[in-house]
Amino acid sequence: GRIGKAKLHTADSSNHWEYSQERFMENMAESAKATTDFFGKQIIYINVLRNMSVDCDCAGLAAAPPTTPDIGILASTDILAVDQASIDLVFALPDAAKHDLQERIESRRGLRQLSYMKELSMGNDQYELITIE
């Protein structure tokens, strides 16, 4: 609900206008861990790397237009592997194609999600990409 979303986005700060980006990313990882712990091995993670905007999905139609080209669809039974592969594919794009998205990820401490997921033993950051055409 509204209160839970506010706590997640503000790292449970009493001042909802100031919060730690790093703590927000850790909250996101902890939320994902609760879900993965509940479902166990009965879950598959799918990342669709298409129409990627620098804004959160929650921005809806107000989101900035996509500036990163479509990459594809990734799937795994390992949440950390699929997220690491997604970041690696974005960061491997030519500078002009990745600049805006990479800057947003780095300036918002988005990579902290991956390192914290590893600290929480949520998966493996090593992966093998298998292309299906």
PLM regions: where:
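Extended, low-polarity segments enriched in aliphatic/aromatic residues
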Residues: G1-E133
